[in-house]
Amino acid sequence: MRAKVRILNIRSGHFDVFINPKDAQEWKLHPNDLVKIESGKRSIYGSVVIGDFVESGEVGLSLDILDAYQFSEGELVSITPSETPESVRYIKKKMRGEKLRKVEIETIVRDIVDRKLRNTEISALVTAIEVNGLDMDEIAALTIAMAETGDMLDIDRKPIMDVHSIGGVPGNKTNIIVVPIVAAAGLTIPKTSSRAITSAAGTADVVEVFTNVTLSLDEIKRIVEKIGACLVWGGALNLAPADDLTIHVERRLSLDPRGLMLASIMSKKYAIGSQYILIDIPTGKGAKVETMEEARSLAKDFIELGKKLGQYVEVAITYGGQPIGYTVGPALEAKEALETLMTGKGPGSLVEKALGLAGILLEMGGVAPRGMGKKVAREILESGKAYEKIKEIIEEQGGDPNIKPEDIPIGDKTYTIHAQTSGYVTGIDNKAITAIAREAGAPEDKGAGVKLHVKVGEKVKEGDPLFTIHAESESRLDKAIILARRLEPIKIEGMVLQVLGNL
């Protein structure tokens, strides 16, 4: 079957192939059938959508396909119905609770990347892993397969360090301080980060306030070979592409199987050649991991997986019961991070965590004796060496190295919530703070977010400011104010909690 390509201005998040009803009947195609589109050495798989989007003799390709494959308007292609992929049989095997062999896992991952597996089959895979789990051999095979089906970064400058936080705590701009400290010590740390998905700001969103984060692999290699570090958006790269497709399904199912989470994180580390990896697991009420028992179990899995991958992994279990620093939102966090790097001083929760993590990396990389890493990291921060390194990173990635905190625009539509009673701050709800910042417009509106005026344990008087909401529009500010009043994210109590006596 042959047809001319018609490029449609449609983006669905899927590889959709649009067929005219007359052709579909003649070719015996049905909605959601899997077909192979070929032209020369190029081939893609897509799901059939039948409709009058195209004329008879045409095949419509969505923009999703054009993002990944180059087809031209009017190009003649062949269309072939595809049989059920062999990987479906392996998914059924996992649904029965059986262990998958390495070659079976590789086939599944390849079929996900080639779009032979659609969301229905990927959903079955995710559910099977949620119910039956993966052992460490399966997770290691999955991690390597996910990495090797995408691009791989080859950096000559060794050793290659990496740090990753599993997230869940608002205001976590820690790595913007950790990376320049580690690089200033002479180690190599090519840091790829994500944008916010459910948070108010991913590291990439924050860094983008003062420099470009969308770079190619060649650009990253050049920068890292030259200055030892980068802070870029991993989503602009073809690193572990199967991961993005499975994550999309996981979110829709509200599932996060541990085996997939481990493979998701470590596949990207494997792809960029990381040799020494520090995993940060924030733990506490409102964080992704709420108990020490769960944190230790997860840490053990990361370390064991690292051994199987030939990577040395250490894990830091950190306090995650309240936001890090005083700011939540891209521009607010960028301002706070830059101030800390410039002055060598900043909020205790931010500085101490950054120095603690950087110190561990310095010890892992052999540039600081065991037990002395934090001290060395502090010297690098306070001496201004880390600030000079962040300036290099900013400049190499296309930003202004002389940018100052006061140059960063913050949302000028503001509203401050005040204490309704006197007492002590006994809790700050991470999820509520994140929700308010997002309602104000973060992360899309860079200047939107929340600035805290108090932290847990501090004494407040009635009328004292608790936090200020920043927005770029009055409408977003109004919505955030309504949400803030409903959620009441900061809890204040007196020191006397209850009085008992004789009845």
Swiss-Prot record:
Q: Name one GO cellular component term.
A: cytosol
Enumerate the catalysed reactions: AMP + phosphate = alpha-D-ribose 1,5-bisphosphate + adenine; CMP + phosphate = cytosine + alpha-D-ribose 1,5-bisphosphate; UMP + phosphate = alpha-D-ribose 1,5-bisphosphate + uracil
**Molecular-function GO terms, alphabetical:** 1,4-alpha-oligoglucan phosphorylase activity; AMP binding; pentosyltransferase activity
The cross-references to Gene3D superfamilies, in alphabetical order and at most eight, read: 1.20.970.50, 2.40.40.20, Nucleoside phosphorylase/phosphoribosyltransferase catalytic domain, Pyrimidine nucleoside phosphorylase-like, C-terminal domain
Matching entries from InterPro entries are given as:
AMP_phosphorylase, Asp_de-COase-like_dom_sf, Glycosyl_Trfase_fam3, Glycosyl_Trfase_fam3_N_dom, Glycosyl_Trfase_fam3_N_dom_sf, Nuc_phospho_transferase, PYNP-like_C_sf, PYNP_C
Q: Which domain of life is it from?
A: Archaea
Q: Does the keyword Disulfide bond apply?
A: no
Keyword Transferase assigned to the entry: answer is yes
Q: Tell me any Pfam family this protein matches.
A: Glycos_transf_3
* A single GO BP: pyrimidine nucleobase metabolic process
Q: Quick one: which residues bind AMP?
A: 168, 194-199, 203, 264, 288
Catalytic residues identified in the record: 256
Cite the entry's keywords alphabetically. Glycosyltransferase, Transferase
- The EC number on file is 2.4.2.57
The function of this protein is: Catalyzes the conversion of AMP and phosphate to adenine and ribose 1,5-bisphosphate (R15P). Exhibits phosphorylase activity toward CMP and UMP in addition to AMP. Functions in an archaeal AMP degradation pathway, together with R15P isomerase and RubisCO.
Instruction: Give the UniProt family note.
Output: Belongs to the thymidine/pyrimidine-nucleoside phosphorylase family. Type 2 subfamily.
Q: Which HAMAP family match?
A: AMP_phosphorylase
The protein's name is: AMP phosphorylase
Encoding gene (name):
deoA
